[in-house]
Amino acid sequence: MANYTAADVKKLRELTGSGMLDCKKALEESAGDFDKAVEILRIKGAKDVGKRAERNATEGLVAVSGNTMIEVNSETDFVAKNDEFKNFAAKIAEAAAAAKANSPEELAAVDVDGQSAQDALQEFSAKIGEKLELRRAVTLEGDNVAVYLHHRSADLPPSVGVLVAYTGEGEEAEAAARQAAMQIAALRASYLTREDVPAEVIEKERSIAEQITREEGKPEQAIPKIVEGRLNGFYKENVLLEQASVADSKKTVKALLDEAGATVTAFARFEVGQA
């Protein structure tokens, strides 16, 4: 005869989030000792987390709180769109914002109800039976930060998130900054200004442009000018302020920001599963 009741199983499930069969086995193994059963399930959960660590977590969501944005990965979109997972990520984002987390290491260490975010993640991972990962975090400085979150479909959480720190007051400046955030989400700008492009990247692009131009058989005296033109094309594709605006292709992003009295000082873009 079992030395536990259905109420014990129910209570254990509610406390640990484990399945009914696992709860029954734990109570049997502990001879009905409830606290021991909890310990057994926690140990089992930790072992299962270790097994899940070998699997890839490429789904998930982007969450924002204040000036902070985080990415939390799961293995499947089934978990990603689960309300419990979304609420968990929102809680981590709030803690990350309070700590101004700005790296994966800082994100993992933030305090969540008296334990680290990483420990909270492992417990939640054991509960839902799927590998989870605290991928990254960024916090932008400034009083004004525009946010844009993009959903691949209505039933999924945000898979792309953008933060844009800006200066400027009023609704026009706010709208222009949000439009810039949407631009970054769509066209994946890598740099704010051309001065932000690393010298090694410029040299690589210049070398590629020169090689292509020579292979096209252009006159030697024309090569430098053609190379500079192609380098300018690189800037127009990859530098936010030099991109043609998706809102008005006849104007650059900078021109529209200037018209609204807004100046972008920094931005960050996260896409689930991407670098």
From Swiss-Prot:
Stretches for region Involved in Mg(2+) ion dislocation from EF-Tu: 76-79
A single cellular component GO annotation: cytoplasm
Pfam family, one: EF_TS
GO MF annotations in UniProt: translation elongation factor activity
Residue ranges of coiled coil: none
Keywords on record: Cytoplasm, Elongation factor, Protein biosynthesis
Leader sequence segment: none
InterPro entries from the UniProt entry: EF-Ts_dimer_sf, Transl_elong_EFTs/EF1B, Transl_elong_EFTs/EF1B_dimer, Transl_elong_Ts_CS, UBA-like_sf
CDD domains hit by this protein: UBA_EF-Ts (cd14275)
Protein name: Elongation factor Ts
Protein species of origin: Corynebacterium efficiens (strain DSM 44549 / YS-314 / AJ 12310 / JCM 11189 / NBRC 100395)
